[in-house]
Amino acid sequence: IIGGDECNINEHRFLVALYTPRSRTLFCGGTLINQEWVLTAAHCDRKNFRIKLGMHSKKVPNKDEQTRVPKEKFFCLSSKNYTLWDKDIMLIRLDSPVKNSTHIEPFSLPSSPPSVGSVCRIMGWGRISPTEETFPDVPHCVNINLLEYEMCRAPYPEFELPATSRTLCAGILEGGKDTCRGDSGGPLICNGQFQGIASWGDDPCAQPHKPAAYTKVFDHLDWIKSIIAGNTDASCPP
């Protein structure tokens, strides 16, 4: 996270970290949405990874931290054909449920779509420098604004993004606050609701007039609920 500060230890009980067991590298975030399921970005998928819940500092473990491995992973259309503007979403079933504790509690799915102009909070253990490989020991949090989708489309003509999309655009137009490498898959929380999954942005991060894109959770609710209910053939919205 660029331009943020250390998150309050109590404000991210639903935030999980995806990491590789050997190198202990945190490569993505995710959101616990109930005792057994985590929502993150499809591009965060790796062959072998673990999920750390209830974590704050990488160096000083919370007593109630839990580790899980993915039992099942679900993608849109049961394929990994996501693009920059579509279907960058992955639902992970944990190998065993987690109980609520001091630093672990799921975040409910949104009850209504977000509105442009909302203040949104982003969080993660990703880079805190736009240009250097500087990663914090604790998650950083910062507030950004929900922008018109066009503001993510116009600055990136090379991506040929479609006129409408199931992504949200969020950032600060003057730059300086943004998600960055390592924050992918983490939540975008607008007016207290879990509305987005960090998907992609510019490199270097946090440049003026280069906001980032987030998968729109609200548009995928039917798919998420169907998978959790056991209908594993469900497909994402077209």
Swiss-Prot record:
Disulfide bonds join 7-141, 28-44, 76-236, 120-190, 152-169, 180-205. It is found in: Secreted. It is an enzyme of class 3 (hydrolase). The active site is at 43 (charge relay system), 88 (charge relay system), 184 (charge relay system). The keyword Endoplasmic reticulum does not apply. GO terms for molecular function: serine-type endopeptidase activity; toxin activity. Thrombin-like snake venom serine protease. Cleaves fibrinogen (beta chain of fibrinogen (FGB) and more slowly alpha chain (FGA)) without inducing fibrin clotting and cleaves kininogen to produce bradykinin (KNG), resulting in the reduction of blood pressure. Negative results: does not coagulate human plasma. Does not inhibit platelet aggregation induced by ADP or collagen. This is Thrombin-like enzyme halystase.
